[in-house]
Amino acid sequence: LGMNVVPEIDVPAHANSFTKIWPELMVKGRVSPINSNRPLIDHLDVSKPETIAKIKEIFDDYTKGDDPTFDSDTTVHIGADEFLYNYTAYRKFINEIVPYIKDTNTVRMWGGLTWINDHKTEITKDAIENVEMNLWSKDWADGLQMYNMGYKLINTIDDYGYMVPNGSYGRANAYGDLLNISRVFDSFEPNKVRSSGGYQAVPSGDDQMLGAAFAIWSDNIDKSASGLTESDLYWRFFDAMPFYAEKTWAATGK
């Protein structure tokens, strides 16, 4: 079909599925600096060597062996976004885990290195070269900064491309029930990345500019569940898909 599934195992944040099983690896006694009502119980404490060893073991289960679940042609997404504890440990973790997984697979991650910055721990070349990054927020990952660092970029900026089914547009044009497809058609350009100085163009066709994507986040769950079905989600996907296709697929097929 010409489509490749990119599996994501999200670490070290958004990792409730792991901290429930291994609570000893959880960040304990800390709350989000953004929301004091949110304890960081979904964060793996990557300042502990045993945590990093467990994360490697998890990825090894999928990427290594005689018949790995994720073969060498599979791009593996490691998440790596919205970590809100011990930025030095996080950046050291990125410097260790990305080259480790690169031994078997292409690595993709969500942008977070602008926000998660201790201003002393540099990200190494091995954790940048040929690594793919979804740009989703200028605050978490300044697009121009990530380009200059050398990451391969996928423009997934929330300002144009984030929808939350049955959402209420927490910000103008983003996080609502549907994308603003008129705005996407009129003004979205995949090679214009969002940075602290506004939208900045990187060269069209640049090897570092892989394209663009939009995201459907089914955040309204549990007590906020709206009763939407998979068919409802598909309709929302199909509403936006041709407009992103128009913007990202050139006549050359690139």
Q: What residue ranges belong to the model's regions?
A:
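Acidic, contiguous N-terminal accessory segments
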Residues: R108-I116, A127
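Short glycine/threonine-rich loop-to-helix capping motif typified by GTGT followed
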Residues: E82-F93, H119-V131
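Loop/turn elements at helix/coil->beta-strand transitions in domains of secreted/extracellular proteins
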Residues: G2-N4, D71-T74, K102-V107, I128-N130, ...
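Flexible, acidic glycine-rich loops studded with aromatic residues
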Residues: K120-V131, W136-K254
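Active-site-proximal loop/turn and secondary-structure-junction residues that shape catalytic pockets
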Residues: I9-A15, E82-L84, L113-W115, S137-D139, ...
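Aromatic side chains
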Residues: Y90-F93, W110, Y160-Y162
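Substrate-binding cleft of carbohydrate-active enzyme catalytic domains
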Residues: L1-T104
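A structural signal for short, well-ordered beta-strand segments and their strand-loop junctions
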Residues: V6-E8, H77-G79, R108-M109, I154-T156, ...
